[in-house]
């Protein structure tokens, strides 16, 4: 429930939604010592990478992946149905990446 609460607050900010819906994002960072550098992030979720296909009636906006030994493979997504209604979907503890996306696609097909 905690992940849902955090993600639900994040998606209230247009900049956050824009970033998670991007093919990549580059941040311009200035360190405490004044040095500047650019850091580029690219999505790791299989839907964004074209390695998994969502159901036809669902549009993936973006989300966050995470994997640890203790938590397993996890994914939280913002999606919209064909009428534009938003949904937050979470899968936690999947034993593998393929199973994670199989479970998420199955859940999204219920929308």
What is the meaning of each model-derived region?
Residues 1-111:
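Penicillin-recognizing serine hydrolase domain
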């Amino acid at each position: 429930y905690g992940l849902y609460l955090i993600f639900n607050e994040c998606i209230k900010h247009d900049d956050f939604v824009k970033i998670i819906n991007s093919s990549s994002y580059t941040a311009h960072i200035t360190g405490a010592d004044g040095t500047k550098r650019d850091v580029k992030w690219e999505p790791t979720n299989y839907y964004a990478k074209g390695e998994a296909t969502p159901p036809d009636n669902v549009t993936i906006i973006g989300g966050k992946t995470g994997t640890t030994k203790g938590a397993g493979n996890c994914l939280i997504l913002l999606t919209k149905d064909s009428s534009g209604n938003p949904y937050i979907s979470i899968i936690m503890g999947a034993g593998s990446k393929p199973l994670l996306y199989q479970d998420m696609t199955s859940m999204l097909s219920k929308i």
